[in-house]
Amino acid sequence: MDWKLEKISSRRVRGEEDMMWESIMKTLGRDLKWSRKYNMQKMNKTPDGRSSYSRFKRSIMKRRACHVPFASSPVSTKWCQNMDQMQRTGISSSPSEEYCQIPDPLVLLPYLTEIPVVAIRDCDQKLDSLKDISTPKRTQKVLKKLLSKTRLRFLQEQNILQTVEEHKPGPSIRCDNNMQICEKDTCTWKECLQMKKKKSLVQKTQKDNICSRAVLQPEIQLHISGLHNDYYLNLLDWNSENLVAIGLKSTAYIFSGDNRTVTQKIYLPSPATYVSSVSWISNGTCLAIGTSSGEVQLWDIETQKRLRNMLGHMSVVGALNWNHHILSSGSRLGHIHHHDVRIAEHHVGTLQHKQGICSLKWSPCGSKLASGSSDGDLNIWPCDPAGETKPLLNMPHPTAVKAMNWCPWLSDTLGVGGGMKDGLIRIWDTKCGKNIHSANTNSQICSLLWLPQTKELLTGHGPSRNQMTIWQYPSLLKMNDYYGHKGRVLHLALSPDQRRIFSAAANGTANIWKYGN
């Protein structure tokens, strides 16, 4: 049998040049694959296998581009500078023009002004119309993807613009906070109108709780809106000039106890920044304001000027207190800063807690500083701002130490109220660190005040009764309960003549009580 060989196709012989290029491409491919794998591991993973900070930061930035930023962290980003302004009401003279400044305009991110809202509807209509077109499925997917990206880009830039507008500086009109005296029958406040429908029930409830030995009588009722329902803030103070300062969201209101009117308002630049603490200097009209952005501002109420803006904190400043010219401020990161307001380099000392600062109080003689934190630590510090950084005493509590005050007639005695899971009043002797008296209230204690005229103790409570209670000292025998609020009584303040008490509650009400024998 003869075999016939046929040539089916010509054999291709690779030349040296082809082999060289093939080798080069293989080498480059291996190098690129190894390099990308190595770099991704290096960039995205840390030695312990967790995500790196750069990857975490990129994901946060992508979220901010799509959504309004969350206020889930007390740490301040410091991404915008504040320009504050102060305003008087009608009964006051016009503000000083020397301080009035026009804030620099904020540069907005790109905004698609040429794309109306109809553009979004057009994109949706085009997406729906693709279902009826007899085109290949792959082509439909590509077109849908392109139209979806156009719609998403438009919505993202709209969200970014809204975020920037929230931080836009300037004296914008604030509708989220207000303060006015209740006019009883003619009052037009929303909550007051609702209460009129239940008037008979309210009167009966109050009548049943009136006691013959009552020493507190309601004198003025105020409606307030914008008071943060935050247990860890200190938003009320009454000074020696009979002026009450109260923080309502991004505005500090100044209420005159003599005229019984709101005389001044101090605005923070943006609704995103709120007043977190207020404190008057011992003698004078200098007001310290702590903000949620970590700033401590000093204002002179008489001249209507901001004296200075002291930086240093990186989180919410929830507590302030004065000791002559030394201002102490506490933040939610657990730092306590001492500021000497007389000098340019104001920061003269720092103290440290493990958790956030809830309260700061200097003793009446100014020799000791008491600080309470959210983890239940109560520390007593010496009066040496630039020196010793270790506490004299540490007295642990089962809950946060927020309701705290020094006894005005016993300089070494400190009263502390327990939180939700505690409810105990504890009286401490700070000389030896002993708990000398205690009483169970069966309720959260939100505020605590000493009453010098009758040598008694007043506490403001939370759920479920939201009452104010007077206790006899030192026996801590309950004298009477007072019901003037439907929300927890977060703040209490005593007038300079010690005859009136200002109470502010979470339900948007504030009362001025007449106090005496």
UniProtKB/Swiss-Prot annotation:
Q: Gene Ontology terms, cellular component aspect?
A: anaphase-promoting complex; cytoplasm; deuterosome
Query: Where is it localised?
Result: Cytoplasm
What the entry lists under SMART domains is as follows: WD40
What InterPro entries does its record include?
Cdc20/Fizzy, WD40/YVTN_repeat-like_dom_sf, WD40_CDC20-Fz, WD40_repeat_dom_sf, WD40_rpt
Domain of life here? Eukaryota
Spell out where the chain crosses the membrane: none
Q: Where are the WD repeats?
A: 270-309, 312-349, 352-391, 396-438, 440-481, 484-517
**Tagged with keyword Transcription regulation:** no
Q: What keywords does the record list, in alphabetical order? A: Cell cycle, Cell division, Cytoplasm, Repeat, WD repeat
Induction comment: Specifically detected during the phase of centriole amplification.
Q: Name one GO biological process term.
A: anaphase-promoting complex-dependent catabolic process
Cross-referenced PANTHER family: CELL DIVISION CYCLE 20 CDC20 FIZZY -RELATED, CELL DIVISION CYCLE PROTEIN 20 HOMOLOG B
**Family classification:** Belongs to the WD repeat CDC20/Fizzy family.
Protein function: Protein regulator of centriole-deuterosome disengagement and subsequently participates in the ciliogenesis in multiciliated cells (MCCs).
The name under which this protein is listed is Cell division cycle protein 20 homolog B
Organism per entry = Xenopus laevis (African clawed frog)
